[in-house]
A protein has these predicted regions:
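Acidic, Ala/Val/Gly-enriched low-complexity intrinsically disordered segments
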Residues: 11-14, 22-23
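Glycine-rich hexapeptide-repeat left-handed beta-helix
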Residues: 21, 26-39, 72, 78-107, ...
Length: 208
């Protein structure tokens, strides 16, 4: 009986949160110690995803099915209009004597994180596309306006210069981006904002 009541209370909290913040989600927002995810406006978090601890999600972000974002031993920050696609894993590096600040995970604005990407304690600039299945390790810094090809491995502490296409295992700089490709980075982010809004509108229509 008490378990059933607890589920009803949790569902009510989620319903109120979705009404106020226009968030499409279930009770997959979880605390870690004193930290609870901070969610911006018009955010979509799929019900099958998990967001834990010190995670700061800005306005118009979309988190698609089966994503795990774990801000437990450091923080995760995701900038406006970025999208985290299906099956991706986002985590951080703890603080230690070796590196007192650890490695948070910082994602800029208008970033597209493709399906099944792994991001661990790295920093990503604005208008970046991380191709499907890519892995970015601790201490990686990616500049603005960068494309990373599918299946790439970006080794620990590597820096990717702004304005280039990178690809490979380990990743290598291939060539400068064309103007069309630069525009495509913004197009991708805007498309995911549009699709996210369609999901939110659909969810609002079925709310009692």
């Amino acid at each position: 009986r008490f378990q059933g009541l607890h589920r009803k209370i949790k569902a009510t909290k989620v319903f109120l949160c979705s009404r106020i913040f226009e968030v499409y989600m279930s009770a997959q927002l979880r605390p870690y110690k004193a930290f609870f995810p901070q969610i911006g406006l018009r955010v979509m978090i799929d019900a099958s995803s998990v967001v834990i601890g010190d995670v700061r999600i800005a306005d118009d972000v979309s988190v698609w099915p089966l994503v795990a974002i774990r801000g437990d031993v450091n923080y995760v920050s995701i900038g406006q209009r970025s999208n985290i696609q299906d099956g991706s894993v986002l985590h951080v590096t703890h603080k230690s004597s070796y590196k007192p600040e650890g490695n948070p995970l910082i994602i800029g604005e208008d970033v597209t994180v493709g399906h099944k990407v792994m991001l661990h304690g790295c920093t990503i600039g604005n208008r970046v596309l991380v191709g499907m299945g890519s892995i970015l390790l601790d201490g990686v810094v990616v500049g603005d306006d960068v494309m990373i090809g599918a299946g790439s491995l970006v080794p620990q502490n590597k820096q990717l210069e702004s304005g280039y296409l990178y690809f490979g295992n380990p990743v290598k700089q291939i060539r400068p981006l064309t103007e069309a490709e630069r525009e495509g980075l913004k197009y991708s982010a805007n498309n995911y904002v549009k699709w996210k809004n369609e999901y939110l509108d659909q969810d609002n229509q079925i709310q009692p």
